[in-house]
Amino acid sequence: MNHQPPPVSRIGWDDQKIMRTRRELDSVKAIMKENVQKIMERQGKLDDLVERAQRLEEASDVYVKCAVKIKREMSWKANSLRYGIIAVSSVSAFAGLAYSFL
């Protein structure tokens, strides 16, 4: 009841066909090994790209925070200069009015 395929020699293959098939098999194995190696290299490159993208994202977050902080500081400086000029003008105007009533 055990059905095994007949040995290669009984199928009618000669040594040349077997050798040609083995060479083809070796060629396919070499190509597959090369493909697996390329896949592994690509995976490494993809991992590097993911890491670089994460670092760029972190750097952009820091940049945005710094830009917002600088914008606030510049706005505060600009407004304080305006308020200072208004205050000095107001004091001068009141002083002028007060002097004119004397």
From Swiss-Prot:
InterPro entries assigned: Synaptobrevin-like, Synaptobrevin/VAMP, V_SNARE_CC
Classification via Gene3D superfamilies: 1.20.5.110
GO BP annotation list: vesicle fusion
Gene Ontology cellular-component terms listed: plasma membrane; SNARE complex
Residue ranges annotated for the v-SNARE coiled-coil homology domain, each copy included: 17-77
Keyword Coiled coil: yes
Gene Ontology MF annotations: SNAP receptor activity; syntaxin binding
PANTHER family, sorted: SYNAPTOBREVIN FAMILY MEMBER
Protein name: Synaptobrevin-like protein 5
Species the sequence originates in: Caenorhabditis elegans
